[in-house]
Amino acid sequence: NPQGEGIDGEFDQAPLYCFDGFDCVTFVNNVLALALSHNLSEFQKKLLLINYYDGIARFDNRFHFMSADWNVQNQKNKFVTDITADIFDEKNKSIALFAEGEIDKPNWFLKKAESETAERADYLRRIALIVKKEFVSLPYLPLLKLFDENKNPREYLFNQIPNTSIIEIVRPNWNLKDKIGTNLHVSHLGFAIRKSNGELFFRHASSEQKCVVEVLLSDYLKNILKSQTIKGINVQAIYQRIAGSAVAGLFFS
């Protein structure tokens, strides 16, 4: 487990952070926190703000859902801003569509409780009584708009994606309710990294390759065009004061 609430955590005693193993979310969280910080203490504080309500490390406070928690709170904290709807076609019209639907937080906690010990299950059921379902409207760039009829990338669209942006892979109302208790809208994420030659890469923690990898963003997306559930990408731009800092340059090159 690459992330928990630390040894004093009530539910999850895994480390608050580690650098020898990531999933896609913890990779983004750690890199973003490092880019915001100049020392270990600052990194630890920023990491808590990036991943927990009020920066308090408790399982019930964690941003479990990208669309309902992570995006909303990190926009409020002014770490990122959603620019998906600001990507325009050649007629200067936004190409964004919206993934809309409920995130059933109570049922997610109840479903998770089914596979836990009695004491841990009771903890999760108590949380389920407090949290509420949330309606989410998440903009995304449709894959079918990002490529032409011959599956060639429309470069003028990719060129509008800023360097260091966070790319979220969007599956509108991804049907996981029977498995985890709720549908989801986001299944994966990583960074868009623009090289000096202008090429835009997708840097992400790959569950298939078991490491952090880079691939041309257009190639990555082209390979999933046939997916029945993946429909597009959401773009969260990192605030320029962060992306343009000297510290951030170490991580986004």
Question: Which residues fall in each region the model found?
Answer:
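Acidic/His-rich structured neighborhood in mature extracellular/periplasmic domains
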Residues: 2-148, 159-162, 171-173, 186, ...
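Compositionally biased, low-structure terminal segments
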Residues: 136, 252-253
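Phosphate/adenylate-binding glycine loop and adjacent helical scaffold
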Residues: 151
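Short, solvent-exposed, low-complexity loop/linker segments
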Residues: 154-156
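C-terminal soluble interaction/assembly domains
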Residues: 167-252
